[in-house]
């Protein structure tokens, strides 16, 4: 797909005004966010050129691998965590903060996110539907007990006894959707309902190429929602969007907030 990168100065002010007006008058507005929202926080994209999956084999993080070789799965997961975060401590950027501001001002009802970084929560957004889970927790595969991931990962990194285990004896795993696993029904059902009921649907920083999340803007558009796509690259949903803003999300979203 073409990569037509523009700055905020290349976006027609009338388009920004139109998006702001749509949000101002909407009864229900929803945002779907992808990796492009978090790259400005220093988190690399998983897909695309030089993405994480270009350097790490996704098969190493498949559900089958966890079942067959939990120690190897965890060793590779520690390596993946280092590749993603290294020495950085990611913080919310202007895009996360703008979405939180839209919600606080009553112009956004929920954020549906494909990201697992927890930065929408950190920015102060109250209603976040984490479609792929979150790396900030681990969950016991047997009893479902959840713990803070940072503590467990630090203990695992300092131990030769992998995988980390719950008090019940079950194996802890990242509280994310692994390859080979379906998206949680509760999260997906809520996301579909919000998309269907929305008057405005913002698709922000997502290639809209990964199902089933990529179906959400389609559901919204079919329900007569005003679809707005904010992404550097073309997406499969551009043709059905009322507005396509091909510019930096950390510039576009604050510019919309300023107009409200």
From Swiss-Prot:
Annotated active site: 132
Keyword Kinase among UniProt keywords: no
PROSITE patterns from the UniProt entry: SIRTUIN (PS50305)
Cofactor: binding comment: Binds 1 zinc ion per subunit.
Binding locations of NAD(+): 35, 39, 46-47, 114, 116-117, 132, 206-207, 231, 248-249
GO terms for cellular component: cytoplasm
Cellular localisation: Cytoplasm
Chain residues that bind nicotinamide: 46, 116-117
Recorded catalytic activity of this chain's protein: N(6)-acetyl-L-lysyl-[protein] + NAD(+) + H2O = 2''-O-acetyl-ADP-D-ribose + nicotinamide + L-lysyl-[protein]
Cofactor: Zn(2+)
Pfam family, one: SIR2
SUPFAM superfamilies in the record: DHS-like NAD/FAD-binding domain (SSF52467)
MF-aspect GO terms: histone deacetylase activity, NAD-dependent; NAD+ binding; zinc ion binding
Span of domain Deacetylase sirtuin-type: 9-260
Enzyme Commission code(s) on record: 2.3.1.286
Protein family: Belongs to the sirtuin family. Class U subfamily.
Role summary: NAD-dependent protein deacetylase which modulates the activities of several enzymes which are inactive in their acetylated form. Deacetylates the N-terminal lysine residue of Alba, the major archaeal chromatin protein and that, in turn, increases Alba's DNA binding affinity, thereby repressing transcription.
HAMAP family: Sirtuin_ClassU
Protein name: NAD-dependent protein deacetylase
Organism: Haloarcula marismortui (strain ATCC 43049 / DSM 3752 / JCM 8966 / VKM B-1809)
